């Protein structure tokens, strides 16, 4: 019996007690929904397999003492199929012990779940166990990473790549249609600074400083070897196309009042660099994401909002709703009407659009586009965007939507890359930062994705490079992957020994170690549902680590495949000791049951790792 089935049973009993007049003043409408009646795993196994606090939840509403209300609950539970014992403990806890067959039923449930149909989206051989449809019918637009196209993806963006894709997988496993979207900021001042930086690098590489050209990187510009690389690529591409950048620069250069060069190339050459370099960065970012196993459904270009008139249209929509006013020569969004701390300029007094104007148009587009309009627009933003939440939620409300429902904003905290307890700066190409490609080159995609997804994105996080590169149980991804590989090795040994679980009697899974593994397997569906509802995919990773720990302990305590004297795993050369080891061998029927349990663990680990975008290895 699964925890979900127990919760449903408890809910049914609550309604039956109301009908029978055994629940005091409690009425049906005061009974919480099933998902609020979750059972818990007792820390002390002497207290049973599962515990419920239903009596304490409802005692006040029933006008009864918790223990008095717990007694009829316990009596009804004791009559249910699959339950061996029920006890009322403490102030009103109900401790439930399942019979061995009922507890072991989860093994059949896991292995009988159908294979997923969209196999091309999965890394591992996954099945439907744990997946549900409670978010079915919803289209969720999940925008993440969205780093400016002015350099490689840094470690903060890498965290969002790992967390965002894991979140998308978790939401899809709960029935939602998820649109993974990357917002490509190819408009605005940061692109101008990028182009200026490239022009300066080009001028320096071509020794144009003596001619008065600006060769120093602008104080607000971008630095790093990648700037020099891209500048050289732009020059080579331009020359291949018959464009003379030096001639353009001379055309732009101009002279000051003394007849000397102004020292900074202007619009023509800068535009040439912009239009060639931005697509180059776009291609590089796309490749980095693909190599990191993140496949976006939509790459949305900010420039298109202006080119297609969507910014003007969105402002007109807000104007029609009475939320736009003019003041001091500028156009303002009256966001204070909707909870913001101050009103926001959207068109400056010089006629230029403020950055927020594009955000307004972008949200409106997400909600009303022809293909896959979003029921919920989820934004995953960095810690430096915390002050942006108020205006975004105000804009959502101004469009008649519900903040927190139609728009959700998740803020991620900082990541520090450490080695031997000290911060690491390992990128020669991008200057004083760590990039996605740097991290992957050191620890690999699996370790990078798992480590970044296993921590709550609301908290600062330190990555230990030495730990992630190690093959020890202290390395979380190794620990979980090794559990899967170990289970595969059990299968290989069982095949050699001629053991099959066909027709296995799962009631023989009756030891304490067996029970711990069974309970862990049963919790996977609720973990997956909670991870989706809370928008916290790290809960899947933490569950996998607990399952792996339970499995490794079980493996060391309960033998699955019988040992023979010639087994390489036989310990030592002492024949008496070997005989003692062999005496621990399970009888064939119990070995078959344990093999089936082994394969159920294997399946759940494969399912869970797939949700994190991490492979489940056959061998390690």
Curated annotation (Swiss-Prot):
Keywords: Aminoacyl-tRNA synthetase, ATP-binding, Cytoplasm, Ligase, Nucleotide-binding, Protein biosynthesis. The keyword Protein biosynthesis applies. CDD domains: ArgRS_core (cd00671). A motif ('HIGH' region) lies at residues 147-157. SUPFAM superfamilies: Anticodon-binding domain of a subclass of class I aminoacyl-tRNA synthetases, Arginyl-tRNA synthetase (ArgRS), N-terminal 'additional' domain, Nucleotidylyl transferase. GO terms for molecular function: arginine-tRNA ligase activity; ATP binding. GO terms for cellular component: cytoplasm. Disulfide bonds: none annotated. Pfam families: Arg_tRNA_synt_N (PF03485), DALR_1 (PF05746), tRNA-synt_1d (PF00750). It catalyses: tRNA(Arg) + L-arginine + ATP = L-arginyl-tRNA(Arg) + AMP + diphosphate. Its EC number is 6.1.1.19. GO terms for biological process: arginyl-tRNA aminoacylation. It is found in: Cytoplasm. Belongs to the class-I aminoacyl-tRNA synthetase family. NCBIfam families: argS (TIGR00456). Monomer. This is Arginine--tRNA ligase. It comes from Bifidobacterium longum subsp. infantis (strain ATCC 15697 / DSM 20088 / JCM 1222 / NCTC 11817 / S12).
């Amino acid at each position: 019996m699964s925890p979900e089935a127990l919760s449903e049973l408890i809910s049914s009993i609550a309604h039956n007690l109301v009908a029978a007049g055994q629940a005091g003043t409690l009425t049906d409408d005061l009974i919480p929904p099933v998902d609020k009646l979750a059972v818990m795993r007792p820390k002390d196994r002497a207290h049973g397999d599962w515990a419920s606090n239903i009596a304490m939840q409802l005692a006040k509403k029933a006008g009864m003492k918790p223990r008095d209300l717990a007694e009829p609950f316990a009596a009804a539970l004791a009559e249910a199929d699959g339950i061996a014992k029920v006890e009322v403990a403490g102030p009103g806890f109900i401790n439930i012990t399942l019979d061995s067959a009922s507890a072991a039923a989860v093994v059949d449930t896991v292995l009988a779940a159908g294979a997923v149909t969209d196999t091309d989206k999965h890394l591992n051989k996954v099945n439907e166990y744990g997946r549900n449809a409670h978010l079915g019918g919803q289209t969720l637009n999940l925008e993440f990473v969205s780093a400016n196209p002015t350099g490689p993806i840094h470690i903060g963006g890498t965290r969002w790549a790992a967390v965002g894709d894991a979140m998308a997988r978790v939401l899809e496993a709960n029935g939602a249609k998820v649109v993974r979207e990357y917002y490509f900021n190819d408009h605005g001042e940061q692109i101008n600074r990028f182009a200026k930086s490239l022009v300066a690098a080009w001028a320096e590489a071509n020794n144009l400083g003596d001619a008065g050209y600006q060769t120093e990187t602008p104080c607000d510009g971008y630095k790093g070897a990648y700037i020099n690389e891209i500048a050289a690529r732009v020059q080579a591409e331009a020359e291949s196309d018959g464009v003379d950048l030096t001639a353009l620069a001379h055309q732009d250069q101009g002279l000051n009042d003394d007849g000397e060069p102004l020292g900074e190339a202007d619009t023509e050459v800068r535009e040439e660099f912009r239009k060639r370099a931005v697509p180059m960065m776009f291609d590089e970012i796309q490749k980095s994401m693909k190599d990191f196993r993140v496949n976006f459904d939509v790459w949305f270009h900010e420039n298109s909002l202006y080119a297609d008139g969507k910014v003007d249209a969105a402002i007109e929509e807000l104007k029609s709703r009475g939320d736009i006013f003019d003041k001091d020569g500028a156009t303002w969004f009256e966001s204070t009407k909707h909870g913001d701390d101050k009103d926001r300029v959207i068109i400056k007094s010089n006629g230029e659009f403020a950055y927020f104007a594009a955000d307004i148009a972008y949200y409106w587009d997400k909600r009303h586009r022809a293909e896959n309009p979003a029921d919920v627009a989820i934004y995953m933003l960095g810690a430096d965007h915390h002050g942006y939440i108020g205006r975004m939620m105000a804009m959502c409300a101004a469009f008649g939507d519900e903040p927190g429902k139609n728009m959700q904003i998740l803020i991620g905290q900082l990541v520090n890359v450490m080695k031997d307890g000290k911060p690491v700066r390992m990128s020669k190409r991008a200057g004083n930062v760590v990039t996605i490609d740097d991290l992957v080159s050191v620890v690999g995609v699996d370790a990078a994705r798992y480590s970044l997804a296993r921590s709550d994105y609301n908290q600062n996080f330190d990555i230990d490079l030495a730990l992630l590169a190690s093959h020890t149980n202290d390395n979380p991804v190794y620990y979980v992957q090794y559990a899967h590989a170990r289970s595969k090795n059990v299968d290989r040994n069982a095949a050699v020994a001629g053991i099959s679980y066909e027709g296995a009697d799962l009631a023989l899974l009756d030891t304490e170690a067996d029970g711990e593994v069974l309970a862990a397997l049963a919790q996977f569906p609720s973990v997956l549902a909670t991870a989706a509802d809370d928008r916290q995919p790290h809960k899947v990773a933490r569950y996998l680590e607990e399952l792996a720990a339970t499995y490794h302990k079980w493996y060391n305590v309960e033998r699955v495949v019988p040992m023979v004297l010639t087994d390489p795993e036989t310990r030592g050369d002492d024949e008496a000791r070997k005989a003692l080891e062999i005496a621990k061998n399970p009888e064939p029927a119990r070995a078959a049951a344990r093999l089936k349990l082994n394969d159920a663990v294997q399946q759940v680990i494969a399912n869970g790792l797939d949700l994190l975008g991490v492979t489940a290895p056959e061998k390690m």
